[in-house]
Amino acid sequence: MNKKVSAVLIAVALTAAGHVSAAELNAYSIMPEKYASRIFAEFTKDTGIKVNFLRFSSGEALARLTAERGNPQVDVMLGGPAATYAAGMKDGICEAYRPKDSDAIPSNLRDPGNYWTGIGVIPLCFLTNTKFLAKNNMKAPSKWADLLDPRYKNNLQMADARTSGTATERIYSLVKVMGEDEAFKFQKKLNGNIQMYTKSGAGGAMPIATGQCASGIFYIVDALDIAQQGYPVTITYPEDGVSFGIEATGVIKGGKNNAEAKQFVDWAASKKFAEFIVANKINYVPTRTDVKTSNPILDLSKIHTVQVDTAWKGEKRKEYTQRWINEVIK
């Protein structure tokens, strides 16, 4: 079926669903569909509430919610960086709601006004094809500057800041590590090695896995998924520092199934949900302090992380995206 036609039909179904049954929920997911479908299926299994959802990148989801705020088409949003929610809060997109049993989630991983709740932590990382490294007698990148190596020319893929929260997270990282002006100068140099900017954050991961390009910058959840499938890749973190995203969820203001939306957010903030993502290798670091992951690559204490305030990210998103357009890719 034509993708555009399919999307229209699903959107119609989402609209209709709110009028058909109180036991249904309409959602946008920024989280990749392969994870969202499993999560929503588990929620339905636990509650009996059917979920109709569409998947978009963070920029696309934010644009749709902003356009639809007078007549919301969904009740809840799953996933995506908390900065996306922060950017939309001032436009009245989200409804304040603190989920039940959320005390086990540290306050820095929840919005102080309860407009979003963190359900996972995801640092950025480098994902690199090991066959490319061996062929070129190279080591995997361990610092941001390593990506400027001329052997990477036309061999890097990473996300487009106009559509992807992964890309804006990359900008925030660089600004915190290098300073604002130096970060944009670095990205201009880096642009010379870029093969393609992808619409979604995970878009370049499979081309790296299959050797169509060499390396890129991704959230760990996307990079680790590729590694766990057995592709010839290695994952490394920038020693000079990297920020992390807070994967969030929140109730959409004015949604037709408000009670069900709150029930979903309660469930997503629960210990049961955190245990579910760990058991099913949905590779977010749980935000709850009472659930741990045993995968050493997800041990945040071993990574040089730079904490970036979520509210600041929301304030800077448009400014930095426009600056990236003007100074980096033009």
Name the predicted role of every residue range.
Residues 30-31, 36, 73-212:
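Extracytoplasmic ligand-binding site segments that recognize negatively charged/polar headgroups
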Residues 294-330:
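Extracellular/periplasmic bilobal clamshell ligand-binding domains
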Residues 127-132, 246-257, 276:
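A bilobed periplasmic-binding-protein/Venus flytrap-type ligand-binding module shared by bacterial periplasmic
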Residues 186-191, 197-198, 229-253, 289:
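Periplasmic-binding protein-like
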Residues 252-308:
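Mature extracytoplasmic/periplasmic domains
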Residues 83-87, 209, 214-232, 281:
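A ligand-binding cleft/hinge motif common to bilobed small-molecule-binding domains
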Residues 22-87:
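Early extracytoplasmic/lumenal segment of secretory-pathway proteins
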Residues 16-22:
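Sec/Tat signal peptide C-region and signal peptidase I cleavage site
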